Amino acid sequence: YFKRHDGQAVTCDDFVDAMADANQKDLSQFKRWYSQAGTPRVKVEESFVSGTYQVTLTQSCPATPGQDKKEPFHIPLLYRLIGEGGNTEQLFELTEATQTIKVTGLTKKPVLSINRNFSAPIVLDFEQPESELLTLLKEDDDAFNRWEAAQKLFMRSILNGKPLDTELVTALKDILRNPDLDPAFKDLLFTLPAESYLYEQVSVIDPQAIHSARRQVRHQLATALQDDWLWAYQEHQTPGSYKPDAQSAGKRSLKNLALHMLADSGYAKVDDLASTQYQSANNMTDQYGALAVLVNFSLSHAEASLSNFHERFKSDALVIDKWFALQATRQIDFKQKQSVMQDVLNLRKHPDFNIKNPNRARSLIHAFCMNNLGAFHQPSAETYQFWADHVIELNHINPQVAARLARALDRWKQFAPNYQVHMKSALEFISKQTNLSSDVAEVIQKALNS
């Protein structure tokens, strides 16, 4: 590619042709990734009969405007069979609507690890049993699929409202303590699926049920591994001068996750740990990470640290944006001392808040309505009226910023009825306003007509 095109303006066809010629491979079907809209889905179905293991792969892609029917994509799928024989990684090229992988001469059904290293940007429809996901979590040598297995196990516990299995907790403990695994990978693996992603996995969204179940799973993870989180926090300190390299960054990420988990577990000394880290930090990651723990868990040093942070960085607009956003996205305390919305209303009166500044508006209003789903989605009209009032106010200041905020209720019809009624009322309230910008009017009408 560089030999042919260095210094030139080239097309996607030029790029693909260079790859094809270099590898002596026909990639004409692969170009459908450029010409067909949408994300392909691949359904995986398994069978194991009389020593023969068969995987049936079926690809599809939903209709999009102007493209009702899609031709099969060229989908490269890396896979490995975990079990007898320790099968090596292989590449399967899915080029037809349906194809099969067949392996004979086996005595036991293997565990399939597919789309390894995220070899294709697809949605994989594959309902593996929890026992097999646990095997992937413990034994797979592919980091992506190991992470994916953990995410699926976490998600099932959250959506089914059940605690984490004892065997899963033991496996997670072993992973956390494993010295051969990268700290950054551990940080990603232990981060639970976001509430917004969980919304996409259910037919009817009950935001408070999802929020509560997610909190409970994280609390179990924190308490069951409290000693291990303390070990992780102590083991991944980065003394000396600040280093921006990947290894140091990974240690900081895992250390801050460990601090968060210690707070969630109720560890008695976490207030002092977080306060000390905040005061001694020589980098923003550690200082902000400690501040986030103090604020999210309403620890005793939270207010003093917030004031100190503001005083220290008040001349740096981007950092003060983070300061506002942290308070707007504060998690709902189990004790529910004060609503986050009340915090946001109080912060609106802060001398550094200016709703006419797009970044500042996003750091507070958007952060609360779009990034703090557990606090925003309440079965009452209050938070939705707050949202509507700010969409209207921003409509007269910056229609583009208002239109982005207006999308917070795009999926209102998928929510439980006791939320829907208040969402619809808020949407209709906006739609009746005069002088709505075309940007905002389009978003609101599209939502109401969906």
Segments and roles (model prediction):
Residues 35-36, 75-77, 124-126, 192:
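Generic structural "secondary-structure junction" signal
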Residues 19-20, 44, 294:
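Alpha-helix C-terminal capping segments
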Residues 8-16, 40-46, 286, 319-321, ...:
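Short amphipathic alpha-helical segments at helix boundaries and their inter-helical linkers
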Residues 1-4, 10-40:
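Catalytic cores of secreted or luminal carbohydrate-active enzymes
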Residues 26-35, 88, 123-126, 199-201:
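Short, charged, low-hydrophobicity "junction" segments
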Residues 2, 104-450:
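Long, ordered, helix-rich scaffold segments
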Residues 26-29, 39-115:
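Beta-strand-rich binding/interaction modules
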